[in-house]
Regions:
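Zinc-dependent deaminase catalytic domain
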Residues: 1-147
């Protein structure tokens, strides 16, 4: 059966896939050792997951994302960064891919998303600072919140 187009050209089939990939991002986020915010990222290209990532510390460091004062350590790698770095270390490319996130990107990650060639970002929760979404808009990366 043909896909029924909803507003913005999104089809029911696309929405179904979007929800499924966000559920995968939830599972990935649960692997994070961070206490304050567990974030998951899934990169999908041609209907296949090519990478996933969650926020955490660098390889070889203790899995402690927060300082004693409760703030996130500077050396924590964001979920988007982990997923994008996995693609960079593989034979895959992010060109035209969709990134699924449990939390919208910060400005730092939005820059990487743009430069990696991600075409679309789907996220569930909004980060406290929306500068990252603003950059995506200015650079032509479509993004949408799916609750």
């Amino acid at each position: 059966t043909p896909a029924t187009s909803l507003c913005g050209g999104i089809t029911k089939n696309t929405m179904k896939h979007d929800k499924s990939y966000l559920q995968i991002a939830d599972v990935v986020a649960a692997r994070s050792y961070c206490k304050r915010n567990k974030v998951g990222a899934v990169i999908v290209k041609d209907n296949s997951v090519i990478a996933e990532g969650y926020n955490g510390t660098c390889y070889g460091m203790p899995n402690q994302c927060e300082c004693l004062n409760g703030k996130t350590r500077e050396e924590v790698v964001h979920a988007e960064e982990n997923a994008l770095l996995k693609v960079a270390r593989s034979t895959q490319s992010c060109d035209g891919a969709t990134l699924y996130l449990t939390l919208s990107p910060c400005l730092r990650c939005a820059r990487l998303i743009v430069q990696a060639g991600i075409a679309r970002v789907v996220y569930r929760d909004s980060y406290r600072n929306l500068d990252g979404l603003g950059l995506l808009s200015r650079c032509g990366v479509t993004h949408e919140q799916l609750l």
